[in-house]
Amino acid sequence: MDQARACQISPAILKFRPDIIIAFQPESACCITQYFMDRPPIITMMHASPAAFLKHPQTAFLAESDLTVVLLPEYVEQVRQLYGVTHAISIPNAIEEQPPSLYESIKKEKTIICVARISRSEKRQHLLIEAFAELQSKFPDWKVEVWGDTSIDSDYIGELKGLIHRLGLERQIRICGQTNTVSAVIARASIFALPSPKEGFPLALCESLAVGVPVVCFRSCPGANHLVRDHENGLLAEDSVDSFALSLETLMQDEALRQQLGRQGIEDMKAYAPEKIWNQWESVLDNVIRQHEPHQP
């Protein structure tokens, strides 16, 4: 964000005279800290893992924010080490509690679902396809649905379709495109699979847990491995297609285990209820504003 953008923001700051500013990304914080000398306190949010911002020059201004808010507790130390931030806390995203009618009465399909941006490097849906290929003969009545925007990376979409064709899995694996009813789509599935190498705070994964669908992801995946607790609300696979396939198989062949992990996932997500998260934010805002009030003689 450059000086021109700062000029766009300036009238609003001068007009409203805010008690505090929340920058939703480091670029915004850079603009405000660099071009506004007489400013209210600023809180900078990071909506991904701190390492994801390493190539952004604007992160040099993070240390000038009054507080940096990250999504998970383990990110607090990371942001301190990477960017010299001294004041950092974690506040997660809010996850809406879903009505029991969405998941208690619905008939579960023998479906493994992946809802994520379709990306070779960031989400690696091809690993799910390769893992399922190891299982399809043993579980011919199971299917895989890959949901995500198909317009962003047409080359990778073509690669996935070619892989499905080569493996002879057209009848069992479907690339579905986008949906505006994520929770409802996930709720009818039996397993949520996310083969990402890293995450910030994966919302679709949380929505899966919130409707009682157990998750399979990689143990090494930051973000996901904080939310998924092995053999409690999902399974954590080691870094190989074979291990991912084994975790899928463990759930595919054990409906009672799927139900047990699903129930725990619903309970776990209650900690992220909106009212709890907004209360945390309200407390943080009050504290930061109070710390910057002029001291009375």
Identify the residue ranges that each predicted region occupies:
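Conserved acidic donor-binding segment of nucleotide-sugar-dependent glycosyltransferases
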Residues: R219, R229-H231, L235-D242, T250-E255
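A conserved mid-protein helix/loop that constitutes part of the nucleotide-sugar donor-binding site
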Residues: K110, S119-S137, V144, G158
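Carbohydrate-associated surface elements
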Residues: E74, A94
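Aromatic "clamp/platform" in nucleotide-sugar-dependent glycosyltransferases that forms part
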Residues: Q178, P197
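Short hydrophobic beta-strand element within catalytic cores of glycosyltransferases
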Residues: P214-F218
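Short His-centered aromatic/hydrophobic patch
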Residues: D2-R5, A23-A29
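Nucleotide-activated donor-binding/catalytic signature segment of Leloir-type glycosyltransferases, i.e.
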Residues: I157-G177
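Glycosyltransferase donor-sugar binding loop
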Residues: V115, K143-G158
